[in-house]
Curated annotation (Swiss-Prot):
InterPro entries listed in its UniProt record: NopRA1_C, Npa1_N, URB1
PANTHER family to which the protein is assigned, alphabetical: NUCLEOLAR PRE-RIBOSOMAL-ASSOCIATED PROTEIN 1, NUCLEOLAR PRERIBOSOMAL-ASSOCIATED PROTEIN 1
Record-given protein name: Uncharacterized protein C14G10.02
Record GO cellular component, one term: nucleus
GO BP: any one term: maturation of LSU-rRNA from tricistronic rRNA transcript (SSU-rRNA, 5.8S rRNA, LSU-rRNA)
Top-level taxon of origin: Eukaryota
Amino acid sequence: MESGSIDLDKEIDELSRVLLEHPAHVEKVLKTVEFDKSALRYIDAILDHHLKQIYRNLTSNSPLHTLSLLQKMASWNNGLACVRVFQAIDWNSKIFIKMLQLPNQIQNSRKGNKRLKITISKKRSSLLLLFITFLRLGTPEIRLEILNSRKLTTPLFKGIYNDEPSVLKELLQCWLTYVLLDHDVSRATKLSYFNEWSLSCLASLYSRDDEIDGISLCNLVHKFFVDACTVPGEGLCFVSNGWHLQKKVDGQSKTIFNRVLQSFVFSLHVHTSTLQRELVLKILKACPDITASFIERNSLTSEPVLSYQWISFVSLLQAILGMGIPFPFYDAETRTVPPTNIIIENILPSSFSKPVVLKALNGNDKFVCFLTVNTLLASFKRLESVLDEIKRSELSEDNKVELVSKISDAILLRLPDSQTFVQLYSSTESDLLKEGLSRILLYFFTYFPENILKLKIDTSIFLRLDLSPGMLDRPFSRLHVENIIQILRYLPEVKWFDVVRSPFVFLCLMYLQTSHSKLRDAIISTLNDVFSQTIIFCPSLAVPPILTILASLQHTSPTQHKAVLEFLNSCINRCISRVFAYLDVCVDCFKKHSVNSQKKTAPEVSPISVTLIEQIPFFLQKRDISDDSKDAVLSWLSDLFSNLVCTGEDANCLFHLLENVNVTAFDSDYTLKPFNQLMSFIESLAVQKLPDYVNQIGSLSQYLLYSTNDELSNSGIQKFGMNLDFLPLYVVIITKRIAIMLQSGDMRVKKFLELIRELVEFSKEETMATSQSPIRTLLSACINLRPFLLQEQYISFNMDFAEFLIDTNASIKGSVVNTCVLDFLYKSFSDKVQENYNLIRIAAKFMLLWTQEEFIGFSKALDSFLSENDDLIYKNLDYVAPLLFECMQFTSTTNANMFSNNSISVLLKAAILKPTKLTHGMFDALNTMKPIISDFTVFEPALHTVENFDLTDCADEQILLLSSFVNFVPLFRKVIWNLLLNNKEALIQKYELLAILCCDLAKQYVAEQSQYDLERIRSFCSEVVENNLDLVLQKSHLIELLFPLMKLSDPKIQYYVKVSNALSEKYLPQGVLELLVLLQKRIDIPSSLRVQTIMRIFAILTRVLSDSPQIGLSLEKFLTNFEALIKMNVDILRDEIDKSTLNSFLESAIVHVTSFSNLRLCLTLAFTMTAEQCDSSRFLQMILAHEKNPLAGEDSSDEIKATMSAIICKLTIIGKNYTLSVLDQILKLFKGRYTLHDSLLCELLAYFETLDDISVASRYKGWVITDEYDMMLLARKDGSGVLEPKIAANTVNQYPSEWEKIDLKVFDDLETTEGLLSSYCSNEWNREVYHPLYALGITASLLHSNQQVSNIQVIVQQNFLGMIVMGLSLFKEEARFACLNFLRNFIPILDEQKFREKHLIKLVLASIIVNVPSSENRLSTLMANFYAFSLTVMMKPTHPLFVGINRYYLQRQHVDVTDIPMYYELLYPSTDYTKSVYWLLTLLHAGLQTNQDLKIYLRRHVFEMICTLYNSCVVNSEIRTLIEKILLKVVALGGGPMLVKYNAIYPMLQMVIPSFQETKENTVVSTT
C-alpha cells in the first residue's frame, strides 16, 4: 500500500505541473498514467487540488481541452464520478453563462473573421456536450438542478439556432430521453423548462437546411416535437379530456390544461411550412381541448379569393374538421357531454363565418366555391358524428332532444340560407360542384328539414341528368346520383308516376343501366318506400314489388326498356287515380273465383294487375307504337304475372281477368301469338303445372321456373348470371317450382333444396348474416310450401325440408314453420289421433328450429299429456321417442327441468323399456335433473321394468343408462347385482359395457355391503376377473374398470405375472402399474418376482426414454406410478438391483431433465441405491452439464427446480463428489436467490467449505460493471454470474429475517426430503431477494477481489453493504456473528480509502457497532432497514433526507434499537412533508417482516397514526396505497384480529381487504 501511495503522489505532482503549464495536454498525460485503472483517485486529485487551475483554464481563450477533460471525467465508467464532477464546480458561474451567450456575438463579429466564429461555436458546443453528459449519466438531483437553472436555460435556447447540427442532434435526443419521456422528472419541471418561448426557439430550427448522416435537421426537429408534444400522458402533452372541461388534480384547486402547447401552436407557421402544419394537426388531435381556441384565433384576414392564403386556410380547416370525435364524448363519470358552445365551435368555427361563406359561394371563381363547399361538407360530417354520439350516449331522451335542438339551431344560424345552395345547384354546370352541393342539400333535408322544406323546390331540377352509359361510371357523377335519389325521398308531393317526367321511370332506367351495387341499393330502397305508400299491390306478397318489376325486365331488350316502363307508369298513374274502382273489380273477381274454387279465403290479386290487364287492348290498339314495343310489353307482362303468382298472387284470378280481355279490339295487323303465350303461362300456373312449351328463356327467373329438371343446373345459373338483389325472388320461384312438383306427386325435390342452398352460398351468405335477412324470412315463412307441411303423403319432403332448414339456420322465432309444428303437436296430443303419431317423428325434426321460449311453452302441454297417458306413450314409443329425445336434449343443454315427477317417471320407464333415441337423451339429461329430483319414487316404474331384464338381449344404450341409474338411485343397486349374478353368460358377450356397470356397482359396495350376499358377490367378482383379465390387459381403457372388481375378488399370484407380462415398449398404460400395486397390497408376492418385474420395467423404460425426444402425458403418469411401485419395494431393491440395469436407466432418464415425474423417479432411486450400485459421480456430472438443466433457465417451475437441487445434493453426498469441478458447475447453476432450490445449493456450497479448505470465494476473480442498466458481472474462473443491484435493494426491503439453516441430514431419509420439497411454494420463499448466506458471501468476495475506492463505493451505493447490515436482524446467531464480524473488519479498510463520503459511512457503521455490541443482540428488522437505508443516503448529499439522517447520527451515539428511529422528525417535518411521510411509511413497510416486529408498532401506536393519516386530506394516492400494503402485511402475519380488537380499525380494513370477514369472525372467537 505504501509503494502504491508513493507512486500516486508522484503521478499527482506530475499531473499538477502539466495542468499548470500545459492544460491542453491533460488528456495525453492521463493516458500515460493509465487513467482507466486508477480513475477515481486521479479524478479526486484533480478536483481537490487543481480546481482553481480548472477555473483559470475555463476563463482562458482556449477552454476546449478543459471542457473535454470534465466531460471524460463525468462520463467515466457510465458516470460513476458524474456526481463528483458536477458538485465540484459552480455551474451558475458567469463563465458558463458567457460561453452560452457567445454565439450571439457571431452576428456582431466582422464578416471576414471566420476563425473567431469557429472558436466561439466550438466553446458553446463543448459546453453543451458536457451538459448532455450530466443529463444522461447524472442523478435525478443533477438533472433537476440543470433544468431549474434559469441563468443557463435562457442563453442556451437563445443561441440554439446557430449550434452545430451534430450537437443539436445529441441535445434533442438527450432532452427527449432523459427529460421529456422520463417519468421521474415532474411535469411542472418539464413545462417550466420547455415553456412556449423555449419551444418557439426550437421551432426556429425548422428553417435550417443542414443534414446529418443523410437526414435533414428539420426532420430531426420535427421528430423531437412529435414525440414530445403529441403523445397523451408523455412529454409536454397532458391526457386530454376531449372537449370536456378539464378535471381538477387530486388535492389541488388547479386543473390540468395544455396551456404551453396552446400558446406554442399559435407561433408555428402552418401556412408556409408543411412539417409545422403536420405538427399542429398532430398536437390538436392529441389535445382536442385546445382545438376550439386555435381555430378561433387562426381566422382568415383576407377576402375569399383564389390565393395561397385562402387555399391554405381552407385546407387546414378541412383537416381539423376531418379529425374524429375525441373520446370521451359522453363522460360516464359525470354523465354529461361537452359544453354546447365548444361543440358548435368544433363543428362550424366562427372564423368560417356566414359572410365569408356567402362571398366564396357567390364569387366568380368556381375553385374557391368548390373549396368552400368541401369545407362545409367536412362540417356536416362532423355534425353527423356528434349527433350519432349523442344518440349512443346514456342521456335521457328529453336531454338528447334538447341538446340536438340547441346544436342544430346554432349551426343553422352560422350557415347560409338553404335557398343559396338550391340556386347554386340549379345554375352550376360543374360535376364536382354539383356533387358537393347535392350532398349539402341532402344534409339540409336530413338535419334541417324545417328550413329547406319551406322552399317550393321543383323536382325537375334534380331529374336533369345525363343517363348515357359512361355517365354513371364516373365516381363523382355516381355519387351525385346517389345524393339525388336520397333527396327525392325527402321531397314532399313528388309526382313519382307523372306522365311527362316520371321519377319512377327515371330511377328504373338508371337501375337497369348501372352495375354499381350501392347505387342499385339506393334505388330499390327508395322505390320500396314509394310503393309502400300506395295500395296498388297486395300487402301479403312475399317479395317487394319493385324486385318483381325489375327482374321481369331482365330479358327485355334495352331499347324497349323505356317503352315498357312508360306503359307501366301510365297504368300505375291510372290505378292510383281510380284505385277504388279497381278494388271493386277485384271484389267481383273474388266472388266468381270463390264460386268456382269453393275456397273460403279470398284470393290475392293486386289492383295494378287489374289495371295492366285492362289496358292491354288499349295499348295494342295504338298505331304509333311499334310491334316490337308491343311484343316487349306482352313478354314483360308474361314474366311479371308469373313472378307475381310465385310471390303470392292468385293465378286463377289473373287468368279469369285475361279471359275477359276483348281480343277483337286489338289492332288487326297485330298477331295474337304473344298474348296467347301470356294466357298459356298463366293458365298453366293456375292449374299447378308448368307450360308444355316455352319459346325462349331469356332470364334467370324464367330459367328457374320453366326449365325441365334435367336442364336445371349450376352452369345454367352461371350462364344467365345472378343479381343478388333478386335473390329473394329466385328463392320464391324455386319454392313455387317445388310446390308444383309435390302437387303432381313428384317427391324428387332434394335437388331444388340444394339449389336454394347453392344460391345462398353463391351470394357469399351475405343475406344470411342477420336474423332478419330476407332469405331467412322467406324460408321460415314457408312461401308456397305450407300446404305440404306435416302431411302424410309428403313425409319424405318434410324430412328433406327440415334438414335443409336446420343446415341453413333459416328459422326464426314465431315463424310459419314453428307455428305449424306447434299447432300440429297440440292437436295431436289433445285429440289423441293415432294416425298423427307417425308424423310426430317429422315434427321432432322441426323442433330443432325452436327457440327456448317455444320449447318451454310446449313443455307444459307435453307434461300434462305424459302424466295422463303413459300407456299411450309406451304403446307408441317408436313414434314419440324422437320428440321426447329433443326435449331431453333441451333439458341437458339448458339445465331447465320442464316436467313434473309423474312425467319424469313415465320418461324414465320409457327410456329403459326399449332402446330408442329417448334412451340416449335420458342418459345425457339425468345428471342435469339430479339436483331437482327430490322423490326417488319416480324411479319405481323403471325399477320394476329392470327386474325382468335379460342382459343378453339388452342394447348398449340400455346398459349405459343402467350404469347411470346405479350412481343415481340406491334402489337399483341390489336389483342390478341380482341381474348380474343370474346372467353371468352376458358378461362374456358384452363384457366392455357390463364391466362399466360392474365397476359402478363395486364402487358403492363398501358402504352398502350389509345389504348383499357377500360371498356370492366375491365369488362373482373373482370369476369375472379371472375370465376377462387377458381381454382387459389388451385394452388400456378397460383397465380402470378392473380395480373395483379386483378389490372384491380373491386375487392370485398368477394375476401379478399376467399383469407384468402385459407391459412392452409400445404398451405402457398407467393402470397396469396401479394393478401391480393393488395386487401387492392384497397378496404376498415373492421378492424374486417383484425384483424381476421391476428390472423388466427398468429395461423397457430405458429403451423408451432413449428413443423418445420428449415425455408425453401418458408416460408421465406411468413414471409416477412406477415411483410408487419402487417405494413399496425399497428394501429388496437395495440388495437385489442390478448395477448395469440401473446405470443404463439413469443414463437414458437424465436426458429428460425437464420432466417432473422423471425427476421424482430419479430422486427416489437416489435414495434407494447405494454408492456401489451406480456411478453417482458420472451421473452428477451429466446432470450439472446438461444444457436443459432447469436450474440454468427461467422456464421451469419452482417445483422442478427444487427436485433437481435435491438430486444434485443427494448424488454429491452419496458419492462424496466434493471436487473443484463439481463446485464450479454448481456455481453456474446457483443464482443466490431466496428460493428452496437455491437454498439447498447454498447449504451444499457451505458444506463444501468445511471440507479440505475449499473456498467458494476463491472461485471468483473480480468484477466489472456492464453496459446493461443496473447490472454487474461477478466473474468466476470458469464463467460468469450476474449481480443485480435491483435485487440487492429488494433484499434490504424484504429481508428474510426468519431464515433457518437447512440441515443436509434431511437427505438421509426420502420421506423427510419429500416433506421439505413440498414447501417449494410456501410464502416464506421470495425469488426477488438474495439468500442471506449468499448476500454475505458475495459481498465478501467483492471486497476481497478489490479494495479500491471505486469498489468500496459500489458496495455501499448498490445496497450490498446494506444486505450485511440486514443480517443483524436474523434470528440465527451464527449468521449474525458473521455479519457483525464483517462490519467490524470493513471499518479499517474504509479508513485506508480516500473519498468524500467516507466519514459519513463510518458514522453509520460506528453507530451499529456501538449499539449492537455482540451477536447475541438481535437487531429489529425495522432498525436494520433504517441503518441500511442510511448508508445509501449518506452517499447522496443531495438526498432530501440527508440533513435529517446526518443530524440524527451526530446528535446521539447510543440509540434505542427497539424503537422507531426518527419517528416524530419524519412524521412532523419542517419541510417537504410528503417525501418525509412517504419515506417513514416505506421504512415501516420494510421493517414489518416477522411477528416480533409487530410489538414495536403496537408500542408506538403506529396503526392509529396511519389510520389518521389515511383519512387526511393532505396525503396523495401513493401514501394511501402504501398504508394499505402495511395493513395487508399485518393481516398476512396474523395480526388482523389484534388490529380489530385493540385498534378498532375494522371499517378501514374492510375497505382495504375485500375478504376480511374471516378476520372479523376470528376476532369474535378470540374475544369470547
